[in-house]
């Protein structure tokens, strides 16, 4: 029975993460002339490294959702994770499709705030999930710093 719970958690994590990844990739339409014209910070990593960061973030989310399902911490953690995912999708849409850096900064600010709430909840509930979720939280803080510099420089 424990094996079935773990598999169910992994499947739920994969489904949740793939839905967010699909929606983000559906919204991703990069206009390179516009993107290259932006004033970007010196600490912005190369696109290949950013892709690797996002891939690690997806894997960590799968592990977190699987742990939430098997540990029966499903509500309200999944609601907060879903809101983080939705605001991330809206960020990608605002930044790459609408080319609105102010709206994109607002969405990444909301995502980082929700990730902070989630990180604090995980530290209170279960330290193991908090440690699993820490790379996601740090990624949102890094993204917030990058978008802050881009927003206030352009």
Show where each model-derived region lies:
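N-terminal signal-anchor transmembrane alpha helix
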Residues: 2-27
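Membrane-interface helix termini and inter-helical loops of multi-pass transporters
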Residues: 29-43
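Non-cytosolic membrane-interface motifs at loop->transmembrane helix junctions
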Residues: 39-42, 99-110, 129-134
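Membrane-interface helix caps and helix-loop-helix hairpins in membrane proteins
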Residues: 93-103, 124, 149-154
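Membrane-interfacial loop-to-transmembrane alpha-helix junctions, especially the N-terminal start
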Residues: 72-81, 130
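Short aromatic-rich membrane-water interface segments that cap or initiate transmembrane helices
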Residues: 39-53
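Final/C-terminal transmembrane alpha-helix of multipass membrane proteins
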Residues: 132-151
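Core segments of transmembrane alpha-helices
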Residues: 54-65, 83-88
């Amino acid at each position: 029975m424990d094996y079935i719970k773990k598999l169910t958690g992994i499947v739920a994590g994969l489904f949740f993460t793939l839905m967010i990844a699909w929606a983000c990739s559906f919204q991703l339409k990069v206009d390179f002339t516009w993107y290259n014209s932006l004033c970007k910070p010196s600490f912005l990593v190369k696109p290949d490294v950013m892709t690797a960061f996002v891939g690690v973030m997806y894997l960590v989310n799968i592990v977190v959702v699987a742990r939430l399902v098997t540990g029966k911490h499903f509500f309200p953690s999944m609601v907060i994770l879903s809101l983080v995912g939705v605001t991330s999708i809206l960020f990608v849409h605002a930044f790459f499709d609408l080319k609105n850096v102010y709206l994109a900064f607002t969405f990444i600010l909301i995502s980082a705030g929700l990730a902070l709430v989630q990180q604090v909840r995980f530290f209170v509930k279960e330290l193991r999930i908090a440690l699993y979720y820490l790379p996601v939280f740090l990624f949102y803080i890094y993204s917030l710093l990058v978008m802050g510099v881009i927003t206030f420089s352009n």
